[in-house]
Amino acid sequence: MSTTPVRAAPEVLLLDYGAGNVRSAARALERAGMTVRVTDNAADVPHAPALVVPGQGHFRQVMEAFEHGGFHGPVLDAARAGVPLLGICVGMQLLFDGSEEAPGVPGLGLIAGQVRKFAPAPERKVPQMGWNALEARGDSPLLRGLGPDAYAYFVHSYYVPVDVPVTDGAVTDYGVPFWSALSRGNLHAAQFHPEKSGAVGLALLANFRRELAPA
């Protein structure tokens, strides 16, 4: 009698550089079927099969913590070498050239463009806090299987504008359209909190897992 081999859960390296909700992210990644290794040692990055970059707080402080931990160069090298990378919340914003939150502070520059701040308006509170819809654009593997009624949970004042060179992901409207999730080659990201977004967040993380271990 033949047996079907059990596929091992793909491993991801979750970066703990002092500016992200690592514990919640780790639990969510594990629920989505991944083996999670948490590290505060940048020397682990070159050996990682996949990277997850969380982030919360002020862009300057997050970027300074990232650089102080020695992650800047190794993560750039890994991303440019094609290692799958998932940025979450401010971890998504770090992929770009910089942010209006911290003029003059460079991001990783893996995708061209500047992160912008929501302008205050009578119909819009800043930060955006709560649920909002995801509208799929192009063919992002992160969004596969999600229907037109997909909602995710956001807490943010800064956003990635739709005029950056991205074609695949999800766009959300908060008085201005912005990329709420994206895929570009080996780079993937979500501005919302997958761990707080219920079945939609879990599905997005499971889709990232499938990119690491396709059937």
Swiss-Prot record:
GO terms of molecular function: glutaminase activity; imidazoleglycerol-phosphate synthase activity; lyase activity
Superkingdom: Bacteria
Places the protein is found: Cytoplasm
Descriptive protein name: Imidazole glycerol phosphate synthase subunit HisH
EC number of this enzyme: 4.3.2.10, 3.5.1.2
Keyword annotations from UniProtKB, A to Z: Amino-acid biosynthesis, Cytoplasm, Glutamine amidotransferase, Histidine biosynthesis, Hydrolase, Lyase
Pfam family, one: GATase
Catalytic activity from the UniProt record: 5-[(5-phospho-1-deoxy-D-ribulos-1-ylimino)methylamino]-1-(5-phospho-beta-D-ribosyl)imidazole-4-carboxamide + L-glutamine = D-erythro-1-(imidazol-4-yl)glycerol 3-phosphate + 5-amino-1-(5-phospho-beta-D-ribosyl)imidazole-4-carboxamide + L-glutamate + H(+); L-glutamine + H2O = L-glutamate + NH4(+)
InterPro entries membership: Class_I_gatase-like (IPR029062), GATASE (IPR017926), Imidazole-glycPsynth_HisH (IPR010139)
GO cellular component: cytoplasm
Record's function text: IGPS catalyzes the conversion of PRFAR and glutamine to IGP, AICAR and glutamate. The HisH subunit catalyzes the hydrolysis of glutamine to glutamate and ammonia as part of the synthesis of IGP and AICAR. The resulting ammonia molecule is channeled to the active site of HisF.
Pathway note: Amino-acid biosynthesis; L-histidine biosynthesis; L-histidine from 5-phospho-alpha-D-ribose 1-diphosphate: step 5/9
The protein's assembly and partners: Heterodimer of HisH and HisF.
Active site: 89, 193, 195
Signal peptide residue numbers: none
Domain Glutamine amidotransferase type-1, residue spans: 11-215
GO biological process, one term: L-histidine biosynthetic process
